């Protein structure tokens, strides 16, 4: 029987978009498996073997596979889940679908050496790909603009959103004041340093959740907080588990996402599920994902314009009907169905 392998080695990296992508899509692929389709197999770290049910097979990830990755003879297709992957089947006979999540490095101020490193990774992924998927039209446009894809088909398959859990776990420490919320990795392209200015003239806290990847940038955020004299109301709360994340989304006054470069921007949709005012940048994929349901910061992030927008948005009456219609475009079942269609065309 033919086997389709979905590479989930990125499950090694919790609190990341890649983790969420692999976990949610894997579960949806199992649910959407067509009758008489190929057998699903997941390439996973040891601790995730069996995670997606007994109907699938599991191949264990090993770090040495970056040098040599053997695959069973039954493998008819290998789906590489990220352009950053270092784990490629050693056999070149196997068709490969590669998901490219973003081309963010082209939108960031990086050293020539760092940019060249990223470009090599992307070029390797494109060379090995039989077909490419991006997770937004914005990412597709970037791929076609910055790389020679040599005639390969590029499809767009949107990510989905996780369903809101029935029971939300309160965090160990509950904020004392009403709060604005930002969830993301703490690094420069997330642009979080523009947010402390939004605390001027109100009694709100700013909670910043996520792993600190750039300690120097975290200090820059705190310097901005001191400049606006709101340092006592800017709180770094670190990475949050899924249940805690949903509690913060459910209880925040508004969700803020000023990122300069996103392949998709899933947190925007997660906040909309709770009908919260969402304020984000108008860069890369975010207008595509937020649509008419979010408020867009001034392109240059002028503090006065951002403050006025926040005040306006906090008082706005949001249309739940419009938000529900927008969210219905982004489900993991729809994503899995689209991937299965591509798989069957490739096998």
Predicted regions and their residues:
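Carbohydrate transferase catalytic cores enriched for Leloir-type hexosyltransferases
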Residues: 1-347
């Amino acid at each position: 029987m033919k086997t389709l392998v979905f590479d989930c080695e990125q499950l090694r990296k919790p609190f990341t978009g890649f983790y969420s992508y692999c976990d949610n899509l894997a579960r949806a692929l199992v649910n959407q498996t067509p009758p008489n389709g190929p057998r699903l197999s997941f390439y996973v770290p040891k601790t995730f073997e069996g995670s997606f049910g007994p109907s699938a097979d599991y191949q264990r990830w090993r770090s040495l596979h970056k040098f040599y990755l053997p695959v069973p003879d039954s493998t008819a297709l290998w789906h590489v889940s990220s352009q950053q992957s270092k784990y490629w089947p050693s056999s070149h006979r196997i068709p490969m679908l590669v998901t490219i999540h973003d081309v963010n490095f082209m939108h960031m101020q990086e050293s020539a050496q760092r940019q060249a490193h990223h470009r090599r990774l992307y070029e390797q992924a494109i060379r090995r790909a039989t077909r490419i998927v991006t997770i937004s039209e914005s990412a597709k446009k970037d791929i076609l603009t910055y790389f020679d894809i040599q005639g390969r088909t590029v499809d767009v398959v949107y990510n989905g959103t996780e369903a809101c859990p029935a029971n939300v776990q309160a965090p160990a420490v509950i904020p004392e004041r009403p709060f604005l919320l930002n969830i993301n990795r703490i690094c420069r392209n997330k642009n979080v340093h523009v947010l402390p200015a939004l605390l001027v003239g109100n009694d709100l806290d700013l909670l910043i959740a996520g792993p600190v990847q750039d300690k120097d940038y975290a200090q820059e955020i705190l310097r901005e907080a001191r400049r606006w004299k709101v340092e006592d109301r800017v709180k770094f709360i670190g990475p949050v588990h899924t249940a805690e994340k949903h509690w913060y989304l459910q209880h925040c006054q508004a969700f803020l996402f000023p990122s300069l470069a996103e392949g998709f921007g899933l947190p925007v949709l997660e906040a909309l599920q709770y009908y919260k005012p969402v304020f984000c940048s108008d860069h890369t994929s975010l207008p595509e994902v937020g649509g008419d349901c979010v408020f867009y910061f001034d392109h240059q992030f002028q503090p006065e314009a951002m403050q006025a927008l926040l005040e306006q948005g906090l008082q706005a009456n949001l249309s739940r009907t419009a938000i529900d219609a927008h969210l219905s475009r982004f489900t993991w079942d729809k994503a899995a169905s689209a991937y299965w269609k591509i798989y069957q065309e490739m096998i």
